[in-house]
Every structure is written in C-alpha cells, then in structure tokens.
C-alpha cells in the first residue's frame, strides 16, 4: 500500500477536530533524531514531507507509517457471547430479538464466533447454567477479544444487581467471579435497566465495560441497547472517519439517540449510560466527551476513559484488518502512552515534553520500519 493511497482514511483516526490527539506545536524540533533520521535522510516522500513543512499534526505521519508498513493480520479467535434475557412481555421480546439480530449481523461482518444464550425454547430454565459454562470455556482461551452483550431487563434490591434470565438470574457478583480468571481482552456491554452496579463489579485493567444506567436505581426499561445495536457497525457513527466504528463511537452515538428520544417525547431522562475502560470502576458519561476525546479529568489521577474503547472495533475497517495482532497491540500501547503524555503537557517543560514525545515516535517508527 502506498502512502498516498493510505492517506485519506489515515487522517481520520487522529485528525478530526477535537476527536484526535493533536500536538499543535507545529512539529518536532529540527535537531531531533526523529526529524533528522526521517526527514533529513529523505525517507519520506514529498507527500508526507509537506505535512511537516505546513506544520500539520505529527499524528498524520505516524498513522501513515502504520498503514504503509502493516503486515497481514494474525487471525486470533474473537468471540461474542450474546445473552438474551427474559422478555416478560411480547413487545420486549420482539425488541430483544431485533436487537440480537443486529449484533449477530455485525459479528458476522467482523468475523466473530457467536454463541447465543436465551433462544433455546426446549430448556429455558437452564440459561444461567449454560451462560456460566460458556463463559468458563471462553475465559480459558488464551487470546482474542471476548465480547459479552446482555440484552434484557435488570433489577436491583439495594444490595444486589441482577440481569433477568428465563430461569434463575445472574448477579453482578456471579458474573464477576466467572470472569475473574479472564486474561483475554474483554468487552462487556450490559444494556439492561439497573445495570450500573455491573460496571464497578466487572471493571479491571484491559477491560471495556458499558452499562445502560449509572446506578441500580434506574429501574425503568432502557432504550440504550436498541440504539447501540444499530450504531455498532453503522458508518454514520464513525466520528473520526477512519472507515470503522469504534465501541466508543457507538457508545456516543447511542447515548445521543437516547437523549434525543426522551427530549422529543417530553419525558424525563431515566437512563444514563456509562463507559469504563481505565479500570477505576467509576465510569464516564457521554457528556464528558467532545468528539472522541474526554475533555474532563478522571478522578484520582487515573487516565481518562475512552482511549481503549476507541481502539476496539466489532467490525474492523479494511486497514485495521491488515495489521497483525502484534503490531496492533504495540500501536495501542503507544497510543495510550501518547495520550498520557498529552495530559501532562501543561505540567512539564516544553523541551522535556518534546524529548518524551520523540522517544515514543521513534518507537513507532522502529515498529513499522522493522527495526
């Protein structure tokens, strides 16, 4: 793939206004190793050199390196466990079925192996047993993303939050225990009412947790799950125009739709979705984001939520599929380092900032130059 052919979609991930990690300094100092080794040595085509000459974002160049030198993707098994809860009423049953259908369709496009809990009409009372069995088997696998999506109703009695299955319900505590040994990248989407307590129970490093409500006391039936199912593979939700819709982008799109629904109906908003991907168990509401970047600081000095969720795609784009698992993992780690550095920009001296920035960018250059 040439730099020029890679460029249009490459810009999107880091270049859309207020949605990318832009370093607006105008480029690296001319004496830096990065500038002299790549710019001075003539390793950049004129197309890329123009970006530096015109003081465009360093990120443009970095991403062009990603796409131009990407190797074939290493196939790691990705799994989706889709849990359909007890409907209670026929109307909800139809909604849940439609929502599940959208997830299945998206998972097929993304190449995930799909297991569905809650559709077996012969043994409806065994949903809990089967769910725990499936989770145990999936947790034992060594690699590949694991997605758990819950579509249904939930309850909360002030002590325990539950997701309503057709037989015995599963509690947040039960699910947390089952997932404790998991070392795979994990995504849990809990679309039910009263789902807030699941976020704190399941939160841990390396996980992305989304709940339809911010507490167990938001007990009314939720609409967030319906909108999220529509957004998860919808190009219209792709805020940064990189050819794929991240989990963060889908979360933000669904949240906007929920707010619009209640506004048009003239009703009080009774559900407030949260996203947690930094492991602090607190969660971040959609209002904290401008574009795909959180504009408020996380508590206790933690990194802000949203960075990891913006690196997760149920349906990866064409360029994302070309990256090997190893390259993708290294890229994600470097992106997180850059984000952390960006947060400290006002606290450190400019020279120190550029020195640290240069180290990270050199790592990126070596990663894609095969050194």
Regions found by a protein language model. Name each.
Residues 7, 14, 18, 30, ...:
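Glycine-biased, low-complexity coil/linker segments
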Residues 52-81, 93, 267-371:
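Disordered regulatory segments flanking catalytic cores
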Residues 76-80, 110-113, 141-146, 182-187, ...:
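Loop/turn elements at helix/coil->beta-strand transitions in domains of secreted/extracellular proteins
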Residues 91, 102-144:
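Functional beta-strand-loop-alpha-helix junction segments that form "active/interaction loops"
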Residues 101, 187-286:
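Active-site-proximal C-terminal subdomain of hydrolase catalytic domains
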Residues 151-182:
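A short, glycine/acidic-enriched catalytic loop
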């Amino acid at each position: 793939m040439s730099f020029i052919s890679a460029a249009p979609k490459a810009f999107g991930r880091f270049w859309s206004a207020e949605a990318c990690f832009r370093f607006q300094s105008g480029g690296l100092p001319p004496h830096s190793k990065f500038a002299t080794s790549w710019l001075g040595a003539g390793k950049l085509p004129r197309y890329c050199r123009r970006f530096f000459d015109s003081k465009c974002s360093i990120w443009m160049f970095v991403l062009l390196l990603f796409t131009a030198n990407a190797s074939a993707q290493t196939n790691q098994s990705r799994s989706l466990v889709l849990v359909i809860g007890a409907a209670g009423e026929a109307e909800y049953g139809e909604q849940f079925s439609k929502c599940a259908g959208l997830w299945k369709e998206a998972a097929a496009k993304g190449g995930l192996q799909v297991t569905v809990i809650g559709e077996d009409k012969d043994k409806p009372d065994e949903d809990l047993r089967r769910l725990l069995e499936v989770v145990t088997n999936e947790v034992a696998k060594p690699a590949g993303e694991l997605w758990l999506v819950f579509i249904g109703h939930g309850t909360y009695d002030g002590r325990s939050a539950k997701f309503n299955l057709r037989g015995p319900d599963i509690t947040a505590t039960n699910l947390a225990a089952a997932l404790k040994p998991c070392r795979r990248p994990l995504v849990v989407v809990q679309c039910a009412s009263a789902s807030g307590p699941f976020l704190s129970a399941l939160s841990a490093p390396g996980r992305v947790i989304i709940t339809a409500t911010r507490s167990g006391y938001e007990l009314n039936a939720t609409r967030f799950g319906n909108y999220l199912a529509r957004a998860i593979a919808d190009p219209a939700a792709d805020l940064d125009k990189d050819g794929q819709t991240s989990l963060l982008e889908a979360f933000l799109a669904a949240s906007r739709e929920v707010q619009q629904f209640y506004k048009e109906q003239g009703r009080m908003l009774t559900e407030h979705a949260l996203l947690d991907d930094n492991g602090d168990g607190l969660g971040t509401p959609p209002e904290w984001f401008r574009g795909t970047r959180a504009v408020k600081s996380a508590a206790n000095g933690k990194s802000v939520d949203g960075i990891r969720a913006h690196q997760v795609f149920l349906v990866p784009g064409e360029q994302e599929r070309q990256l090997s698992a190893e390259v993708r993992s290294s890229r994600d780690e470097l992106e997180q380092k850059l984000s952390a550095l960006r947060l400290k920009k006002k606290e450190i001296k400019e020279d120190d900032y550029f020195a640290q920035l240069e180290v990270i960018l050199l790592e990126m250059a070596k990663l894609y130059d095969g050194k």
